[in-house]
Amino acid sequence: MKTGYLWAIASALLVTVAQLLLKIGMSELPDLQLEKQWFDLHWLWANIIPISVVFVGLIGYVLSMVCWLLTLRTIPLNKAYPLISLSYVFVYILAVVLPWFQETLSWSKTIGIIFIMLGVWLISQKTEQTTSH
């Protein structure tokens, strides 16, 4: 397997972790009134854990972007880009399996995930080179 494919999978996994952390962090924060609370040190300190979780999620996005840039150095875009959609698969599975999210398994979502995986597989297949006469 090319190194670029490993970077693409790492990017999708990091996006997955980032999404899950953002969901956890934002779910724990009280409703935001941005004009007041971001400058209130008491509010910030009282919510330091969920804010930290959100911040780590944002770092996950940055690391994912680094992996993605490394992917683009070695893989054609039409092969690399579909691999990003694997994050949909990972997020769905983890949101159903991990108890913090309490997402429900459904047939329609599962079939959609199967189609995504099938599409990624089809696009990643080598294409035959045809010559024109």
Swiss-Prot record:
Cytoplasmic side: 1-5, 69-80, 125-133
Cited InterPro entries: EamA_dom (IPR000620), Flippase_ArnF (IPR022832), Small_drug/metabolite_transptr (IPR000390)
Gene Ontology CC, one term: plasma membrane
Chain segments annotated as transmembrane: 6-26, 48-68, 81-101, 104-124
Domain called EamA: residue spans: 51-125
Gene Ontology annotations of biological process type: lipid A biosynthetic process; lipopolysaccharide biosynthetic process
Protein name: Probable 4-amino-4-deoxy-L-arabinose-phosphoundecaprenol flippase subunit ArnF
Organism of this sequence: Proteus mirabilis (strain HI4320)
Higher taxonomy: Bacteria, Pseudomonadati, Pseudomonadota, Gammaproteobacteria, Enterobacterales
